[in-house]
Amino acid sequence: MSDRTNVYDEAQMGRNRVGYGKWPAVVVVDLQYGETDESHPMGSDLSDVIANTNDLVDIAHEKGAPVFWTRVVYTHPDAADAGLWTKKVPLIAEWKPGSRWVEIDDRCHVGNDDHILDKRHASSFHETELDSMLTSMGCDTVIVTGCSTSACVRSTVDDASAHGYRTIVPETCVGDRSDEQHEAHLWDLDRKFADVEPVDAVETYLRGL
């Protein structure tokens, strides 16, 4: 880690913070049973991630800030709408309408006015309405939570930054089936595309809206 840190420091990566904007949205990535139920081969224990995300979502609800929940769903009979992703991750072909694996975990505090977006690829922005909805709502900040840190969270953060949003990742509100990948990607995201923040700091920001 020290060698990597030195290289990034010399390149001035992560030197500055993007900071918080005036109006945020919380984007909760893929807390569906295919990811949160340990009986599924792709599932892992994300109890703490769900609990910490719920705390943020509850504050967002109180303040009237928009909350989006994304999930991976394939409508084509053989999951052709996944493209080549099923070549690398074949089990996601099971994630179809009516399957338990596409349902958002019941422990999540989904509000009546929240927005549920179905997606077919890793990023919550790719071929979804997310960007246009954020723009119409006047959002300049995206708070990304959910799973997995190394894949769908990562892709969502990358795209949020590319679309010009101040991108915040509460460090205990994201998770991964691999602790090693989780830590590595959080470290890298904080240096390149987002502010990885203590959840308390994000809660304080939301309460101040």
Region spans (language model):
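A short glycine-rich beta-strand->turn/loop micro-motif centered on a GG-aromatic cluster
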Residues: 143-146, 164-179
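Short glycine/serine/threonine-rich phosphate/pyrophosphate-binding segments
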Residues: 149-156
